[in-house]
C-alpha cells in the first residue's frame, strides 16, 4: 500500500520525466512544515542555476521568522525570479514536486510569474 509521501514522489517522478523530455530549465519547489525552497535547475538537471528559500537570513529578517506562510512563499517567488534572471534564465518549466498547486506552492508560482519568469 502506498503512503502519502510515496504517492507524492510518484507524481513528482512523472512530472520530472516529462520536463526532461522538453529540455528546458526547471523551477522546482519543495515545501516543509517550516520552510519553502525553490531552485532553478539547468536543462540537463544536474546544475543549480539559482536558489531561494525561507531559510535564508535575508528572507527570515523580512518575514520575522515565519517561513511557512503564503506571504513567505510570495517573497521566495520574487527572489527566485530575480536570481534566475540574473543567471540568464527567462523561461522555465514549473515542477511542483508532486505537491498540489494550491496555497504556498501557488503563491510562489504567482509571485515568480509577476516578477517576470515565464512558465
UniProtKB/Swiss-Prot annotation:
UniProt GO molecular function: 5S rRNA binding; structural constituent of ribosome
Gene Ontology CC annotations of this record: cytosolic large ribosomal subunit
UniProt entry tagged with the keyword Nucleotidyltransferase: no
Keywords annotated in UniProt: Ribonucleoprotein, Ribosomal protein, RNA-binding, rRNA-binding
InterPro entries (alphabetical): Ribosomal_uL18_bac-type (IPR004389), Ribosomal_uL18_bac/euk (IPR005484)
Gene Ontology biological process terms from the UniProt entry: translation
Protein name: Large ribosomal subunit protein uL18
Self-association and partners: Part of the 50S ribosomal subunit; part of the 5S rRNA/L5/L18/L25 subcomplex. Contacts the 5S and 23S rRNAs.
Species the sequence originates in: Cupriavidus necator (strain ATCC 17699 / DSM 428 / KCTC 22496 / NCIMB 10442 / H16 / Stanier 337) (Ralstonia eutropha)
Gene3D superfamilies, per database record: 3.30.420.100
Record function comment: This is one of the proteins that bind and probably mediate the attachment of the 5S RNA into the large ribosomal subunit, where it forms part of the central protuberance.
PANTHER family (UniProt xref): 39S RIBOSOMAL PROTEIN L18, MITOCHONDRIAL, LARGE RIBOSOMAL SUBUNIT PROTEIN UL18M
Membership in a protein family: Belongs to the universal ribosomal protein uL18 family.
CDD domains with a match to the protein in the record: Ribosomal_L18_L5e (cd00432)
